[in-house]
Structure formats: structure tokens, C-alpha cells
């Protein structure tokens, strides 16, 4: 655990987290623009949650040896991964239990101070159906993979948070 504590205090750990998020975001854009799979509202919200983890990685990169900055990164990571997991589970439910009484919104809704779909519609505009399964890999749908990814992030975060209490004396 001391090794993980030390690893969380160097920029490499936060940079690796950021690289993973860049990979996932690039994958999402590849699905959208190269494979022509239309993103739905939940896909866009899950994309924003993933970017939140990227933001947490950037916070940690600033000065991971500083206790306050490192914990701000952990908190942002946890909030973003938790929100992403909630969204992905809801998205899986839309796909596996389609119902006319339980559907996702028709349009993305962002705050007026951050209308991401207006600023970058190529990345944040949704025009797909949340309940439609458009892609599978190893029998899992995209939202099911996102459940694994966000849950994996929460597990990794928990391990790093626990490691914070194992200091060299």
C-alpha cells in the first residue's frame, strides 16, 4: 500500500489516468464519426462524466504531492465516476427493459452557463435512441462496458484512497 501511496504522489499516476480517459473519449468519437453510430442523450451524459474523470486527472497532475490538490483530484474522480456509473446503469436499464413509460430525454440539457451542445455540437449533440443497441463486443453493449469502466474507476479510486492512510513513518 505504501507503493500505491507513493505512486499517487507522482504525476505519472495522474497522467496515466488522463491517458485512459483520452483513449475512451477518442473511442467514443470514433464510434460516432468513423463508424457512424449516433450517440444518444445518455451517451452524451456518460461522455461528460468521463471528461469529469479527465478533469480530476488534470487536477491531480497540477501538484500530486500537495495533500489538498491530491484529495481534490480524488474527490472529483469519485464524483465523476459515481455519476457515470449511475448514468450507465440507467442506460443499461433503458436497453434491456425498454418501456414507453421509462425513456431518456429527446434532447441533451446542459446549464445555460455551459451549453456544451451549442459550443461543440460535433461532440455533445445527441440524435440516437437510448434503448437501441447499436454495438456489442464480447456480448456486452456499450453501456454495459461503461458500467465496467466506471465501476473499475471507483475500485481503483478506493484502493488509492485507502493507500493514502499508509504513510512511511
Curated annotation (Swiss-Prot):
Pfam families named among the record's database cross-references: DsbB
Gene Ontology cellular component list: plasma membrane
Topological domains, Cytoplasmic: 1-13, 65-71, 164-169
An annotated Gene Ontology molecular function: electron transfer activity
Positions of disulphide bridges: 40-43, 104-130
Keywords: Cell inner membrane, Cell membrane, Chaperone, Disulfide bond, Electron transport, Membrane, Oxidoreductase, Redox-active center, Transmembrane, Transmembrane helix, Transport
InterPro entries: DiS_bond_form_DsbB/BdbC, Disulphide_bond_form_DsbB, DsbB, DsbB-like_sf
Functional note: Required for disulfide bond formation in some periplasmic proteins. Acts by oxidizing the DsbA protein.
Protein name: Disulfide bond formation protein B
Organism: Aliivibrio fischeri (strain ATCC 700601 / ES114)
Gene that specifies this protein: dsbB
